[in-house]
């Protein structure tokens, strides 16, 4: 990556292993993550409630959602930041990483 023609080191994002993914769809627009944005992900397999995570669904598909906890069901679930979409409950949550930054095109 470059900012004003200067290389941008991965260390700019902090400590850890990072990768970028391109957001697809409108499920996270309420968190200002829009279709086509680049999302910087810190690779890790744990996350805190409230963080935006990349997780595998029961169908082994990656999804970018907010991690929340349902006290009644005593389980974690994935929450899209779009009121028109439903929460995703998975039997075995597999976190792949945590979103740390969003890069938008101007």
Enumerate the language-model features and the residues they cover:
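Acidic/glycine-rich C-terminal interaction modules and beta/coil loop segments
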Residues: 4-5, 11-106
């Amino acid at each position: 990556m470059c900012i004003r023609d200067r290389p941008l080191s991965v260390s700019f994002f902090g400590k850890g292993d990072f990768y970028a993914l391109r957001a697809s769809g409108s499920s996270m627009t309420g968190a200002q993550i829009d279709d086509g944005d680049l999302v910087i992900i810190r690779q890790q397999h744990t996350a805190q409630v409230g963080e935006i995570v990349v997780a595998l669904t029961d169908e082994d598909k990656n999804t970018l959602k907010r991690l929340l906890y349902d006290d009644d069901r005593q389980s974690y679930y994935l929450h899209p930041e779009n009121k028109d979409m439903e929460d995703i409950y998975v039997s075995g949550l597999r976190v792949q990483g945590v979103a740390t930054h969003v890069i938008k095109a101007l």
